[in-house]
């Protein structure tokens, strides 16, 4: 009786908050995130129902046990990632009773993802083991549940162990290549949402294939036009009742305003204990398109009725769009040409102090930053984005490239079995989301058998979704099954396929370093000798040339800059704690490059002055401005400095500008009319700290996992941020929250302390809500400045037995009343340099290069007296006879220390001899010794530098991936390797 009374109070409380409950006979989906018990250990017997977990920590999902040991170690050059993270077996447990009246229901649990291996137990019984780490999965709990008021115990053993082998090609046969900090930081835990679904035994199946073998509803449209669309709906039904049933389906297509615009109905007899499927269709008049400027999403509400009584409901999204990919013009969406511009992003989406475990609204926050900058495309790399990320893409109009699970390359044995199953499960789960236009089969090529398997799964489970199948770094074998190719650094491996960019502009720069003239750093001195050493200003300027030069061609569909936010995976600079290639840092504070992208990507008038206007006396510097106008005039204190020199369409440069206190203003014009201005002012002396908070919709929830972000700025007497201020700030946090802090980009072990340096006058910290509502106060102190303080109210979050009817929250999006006019194509008039070098030789069938140097290309007929490098003087002398007449890759010696695991992709015919000459002063990179055999022959360059020749013969038509010249970041002097391709020797 007491349990029933508590549930009644719980339900009344939720109704008072407007959360509501499912109506009688309808499906009830419960938030199963709150109030788990957790231990970072592996005690014996932890799966047993009566195990004593009272001493364990109480947490709420999303949760990771690596939230405070990330962004805290120096990056290891060579794309290794953050290997120094705690890993091992951990346990989560939850004791719960079911709500009254649920006896006779089916009960399913859904995990949106657990990293990496999850053993799930109910009342001591093993339900199954999930190993892929990124794809939703679930179980039918019904037969093992106690419905009589006794406690049920669900236990999850979570193991994030990974192999610390830094050479991905030496992983053991049982290792999962994507479970490595190389590609994804190993943030273990129940790091996404957990849901409990209560249904009638006669119900619509869930889109959770592994362990349930079910697919859920599938909706798509054909014959789309501005006047009408034919909507098709497949609704799979399971009858778990003990008698046959005459089932009626009513499906309502509901528009964004909540109005039913189409109703589909059908009747179907379903035998007891069997499965069946409704197939219905109807014509929707005056449809609204889903597209980046108008991401209109309908809801398809499916209701099952027996004898007039509703027994189950399910809802899926529907977006109406057509996609046509062309080789010579790129993408046409709904008949309009669309140039893709956006970013790649890791599916861990990690933050310092939070790791991969974030509330849904924070994933939306990151994607909304992309959209605010004009982004219309995201490539999740190299595992699937989660449910909140994909749903945010639907709402924001961000075209999505969605992979399964991958690192880089093919997989074998158990790893492939897991990868293929995850691919299938991913397609089934996400196939109704309109934002997904590309299913990515892999980050590199795979075997013919594997490509055929993945393509067949796509064709089986998403035959009508209008999506393309693609791989990055494909060869002709993989391309046989592809619809589009995924390029790298503007490359295009498969000339006959449309190309979408997967990774361009893989440079790095930390946010804290302004330029060569700004205190306290005056450049980036700590990075001298590193491969990547750009200041924020240089990084922003580089952004323009990279975008225009690599994606500017009309035949290129556009695509993804790599990467959006600084990440701990794939780091390459030993003086940074992250791979600093993002347009925003790890805490999502924008760099100058972010605003440059906004000036290039957005359709409305934009202008951005790169940098600030608070310099030491006597400073003279070049000022750069980015704008989508066609002219920019610069003013200092009202005095015109003339019009900028325009380059790469969007960049305007003003040389030798003398700094003086006051203001600098950029005025952008288009066709002679002023369209945008930006002004920056000299900041005065810092006098105070200012704190500003950001929370999710409805404010901070006291659910144990919600987060509040707090920006901390040093400001002058006028409230202007002081852009060169860098100094320690000490914090105090009181109230029902856990301090999670932030990080400093160039400092190890800065995570989760109650102190932090401001960088460029600002930093960002976070607090995680507890389970008690109340006032949370954060105070900040800094020597010489007035203190700052802010109070955030956390709101009560009712939950009972670890369950709530209030589901994770995400902001709503406003839609335009009418379809907007097509966005202007600012790149249309750009004549970009060819970024896809032609093969150019007799024996080389395709070639692409991802390094920063230009001019790298294939030339035919290597001979003495021919040029060796594209960027320096020097000519072959004494070329071995076996290499004479070969195709020769004219490499750039400037890239001798550039680090990329896929620097070159070169395709050759069967029988071709591929030779690589490598400087003897260097250690041999793994890719070289793995793919090639050393010979006794050598080249001597500059009469003193010996380069040993390695060779291999192609047994079939194949594409080879060649990596960096060296894996040793300390290397100072060495020549870039040389590549030759010759025909097979004549038969004797």
State what each model feature region is:
Residues 146-151, 234-326, 654-662, 670, ...:
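Extended acidic/polar, glycine-enriched regions
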Residues 233-237, 303, 623-626, 667, ...:
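Beta-strand-rich structural segments
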Residues 30, 42, 87-213, 240, ...:
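Accessory beta-strand-rich segments of carbohydrate-active enzymes
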Residues 49-52, 245-250, 292-299, 620, ...:
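Short flexible loop/turn segments that cap and initiate beta-strands
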Residues 602-622, 681-709, 713-722, 787-829:
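Short S/T/G/P-enriched beta-strand
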Residues 26-43, 55-99, 110-112, 159-243, ...:
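Non-catalytic, glycine-rich low-complexity segments
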């Amino acid at each position: 009786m007491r349990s029933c009374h508590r549930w009644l109070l719980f339900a009344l409380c939720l109704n008072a908050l407007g959360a509501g409950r499912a109506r009688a006979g309808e499906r009830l989906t419960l938030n199963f995130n709150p109030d788990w018990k957790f231990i970072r250990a592996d005690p014996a017997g932890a799966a047993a129902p009566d195990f004593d977990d009272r001493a364990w920590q109480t947490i709420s999902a999303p949760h990771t046990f690596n939230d405070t040991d990330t962004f805290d170690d120096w990056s290891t050059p060579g794309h290794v990632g953050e290997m120094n993270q705690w890993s091992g077996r951990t346990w989560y447990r939850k004791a719960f009773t079911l709500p009254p009246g649920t006896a006779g229901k089916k009960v399913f649990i859904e995990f949106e993802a657990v990293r990496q291996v999850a053993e799930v137990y109910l009342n001591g019984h093993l339900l199954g083991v999930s190993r892929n780490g990124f794809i939703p999965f679930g179980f039918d709990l019904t037969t093992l549940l106690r419905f009589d008021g006794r406690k049920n115990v669900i236990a999850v053993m979570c193991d994030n162990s990974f192999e610390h082998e830094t050479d991905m090609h030496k992983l053991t046969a049982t290792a999962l290549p994507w479970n490595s900090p190389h590609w994804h930081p190993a943030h273990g835990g129940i790091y996404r949402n957990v849901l409990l679904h209560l249904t009638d035994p006669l119900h619509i199946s869930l889109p959770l294939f592994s362990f349930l073998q079910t697919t859920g509803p599938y909706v798509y449209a054909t014959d789309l036009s501005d006047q009408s669309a034919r909507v098709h709906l497949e609704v799979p039904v399971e009858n778990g009742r003990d008698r046959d049933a005459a089932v009626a389906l009513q499906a309502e297509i509901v528009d964004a305003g909540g109005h039913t615009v189409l109703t589909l109905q059908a009747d179907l007899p379903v035998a007891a204990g069997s499965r069946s499927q409704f197939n219905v269709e109807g014509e929707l008049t005056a449809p609204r398109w889903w597209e980046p400027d108008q991401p209109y999403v309908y809801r398809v509400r499916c209701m099952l009725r027996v004898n007039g009584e509703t027994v189950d409901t399910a809802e899926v999204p529907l977006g109406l769009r057509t996609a046509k990919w062309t080789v010579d013009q790129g993408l046409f969406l709904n008949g309009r040409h669309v140039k893709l511009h956006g970013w790649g992003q890791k599916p861990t989406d990690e933050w310092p102090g939070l790791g991969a475990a974030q509330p849904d609204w924070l994933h939306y926050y990151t994607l909304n930053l992309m959209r605010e900058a004009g982004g219309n495309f995201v490539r999740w790399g190299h595992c699937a984005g989660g449910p909140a990320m994909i749903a945010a893409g639907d709402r924001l109009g961000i075209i999505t490239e969605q992979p399964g699970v991958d690192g880089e390359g093919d997989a074998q044995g158990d790893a492939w079995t897991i990868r293929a199953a995850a691919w299938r499960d991913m397609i089934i789960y996400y196939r109704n989301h309109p934002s997904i236009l590309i299913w990515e089969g892999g980050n590199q090529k795979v075997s013919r058998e594997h490509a055929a398997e993945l393509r067949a799964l796509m064709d089986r489970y998403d035959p009508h979704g209008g999506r393309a199948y693609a791989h990055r770094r494909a060869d002709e074998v993989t391309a046989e099954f592809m619809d589009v190719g995924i390029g790298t650094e503007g490359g295009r491996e498969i000339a006959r396929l449309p190309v979408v960019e997967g990774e361009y502009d893989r440079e790095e720069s930390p946010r804290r370093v302004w330029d060569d003239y700004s205190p306290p750093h005056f450049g980036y001195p700590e990075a001298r000798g590193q491969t990547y050493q750009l200041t924020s200003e240089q990084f922003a300027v580089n952004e323009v040339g990279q975008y225009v030069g690599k994606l500017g061609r009309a035949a290129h569909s556009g695509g993804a800059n790599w990467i959006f936010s600084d990440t701990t995976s794939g780091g390459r600079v030993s003086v940074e704690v992250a791979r600093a290639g993002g347009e925003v840092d790890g805490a999502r504070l924008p760099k100058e490059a972010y605003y440059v992208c906004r000036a290039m990507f957005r359709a409305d008038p934009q202008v951005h002055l790169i940098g600030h206007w608070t310099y030491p006396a006597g400073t003279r510097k070049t000022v750069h401005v980015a704008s989508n106008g066609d002219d920019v005039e610069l003013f200092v204190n009202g005095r015109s400095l003339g019009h900028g020199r325009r380059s790469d369409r969007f960049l305007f440069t003003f040389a030798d500008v003398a700094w003086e206190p006051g203001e600098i203003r950029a005025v952008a014009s288009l066709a002679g009319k002023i369209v945008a201005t930006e002004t920056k002012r000299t900041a005065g002396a810092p006098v105070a700290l200012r704190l500003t908070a950001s929370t999710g919709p409805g404010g901070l929830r006291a659910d144990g996992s919600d987060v509040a972000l707090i920006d901390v700025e040093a400001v002058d007497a006028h409230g202007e941020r002081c852009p060169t201020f860098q100094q320690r700030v000490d914090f105090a946090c009181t109230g029902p929250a856990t301090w999670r802090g932030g990080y400093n980009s160039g400092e190890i072990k800065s995570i989760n302390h109650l102190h932090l340096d401001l960088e460029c006058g600002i930093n960002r910290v976070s607090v995680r809500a507890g389970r008690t509502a109340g006032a949370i106060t954060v105070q900040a102190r800094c020597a010489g400045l007035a203190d700052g303080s802010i109070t955030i109210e956390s709101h009560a979050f009712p939950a009972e037995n670890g369950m709530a009817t209030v589901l994770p929250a995400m902001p709503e999006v406003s839609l335009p009343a009418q379809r907007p006019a097509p966005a202007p194509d600012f790149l249309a008039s750009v004549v970009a340099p060819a970024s896809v070098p032609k093969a150019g030789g007799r024996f080389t069938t395709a070639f692409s290069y991802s390094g920063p140097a230009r001019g790298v290309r294939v030339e035919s007929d290597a001979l003495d007296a021919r040029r060796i490098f594209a960027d320096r003087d020097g000519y072959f002398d004494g070329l071995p006879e076996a290499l004479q007449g070969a195709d020769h890759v004219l490499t750039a010696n400037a890239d001798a220390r550039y680090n990329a695991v896929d620097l070159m992709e070169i395709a050759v015919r069967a029988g071709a001899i591929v030779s690589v000459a490598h400087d003897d002063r260097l250690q041999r990179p793994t890719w070289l010794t793995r793919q090639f055999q050393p010979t006794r022959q050598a080249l001597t360059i500059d009469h003193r530098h010996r380069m040993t020749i390695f060779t291999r013969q192609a047994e079939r038509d194949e594409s080879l991936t060649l990596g960096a010249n060296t894996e040793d970041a300390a290397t100072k002097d060495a020549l870039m390797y040389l590549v030759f391709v010759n025909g097979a020797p004549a038969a004797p």
